[in-house]
């Protein structure tokens, strides 16, 4: 299977430059599979799982949104954040989830209080 260039950039700099056989990710238009010689594409990327295949080996990542640009045999991803499954710190992720849930609860409580005051 023919390969194409994939370049992933984050706010911290170049994350990876690799030659891949296939790229799979979720864009704002839905799930997309990219192969060599794909038609030109520019789209937003959803916060989701992303994977690529190199010589039948699948590499999995968590991507924190961004943009993808495809032109012939070169694909560029500008990601807000990205981590391979090996890089994800499960304890840190659980703590971040707990903090986010707490913030949502606080916003809901404040919203309910404001609604009560207005009524």
Predicted segment positions?
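N-terminal export/targeting signal detector
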Residues: 1-5
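Compact, glycine-rich, soluble single-domain proteins
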Residues: 7-99
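Charge/polar-rich, low-complexity and marginally structured segments
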Residues: 92-119
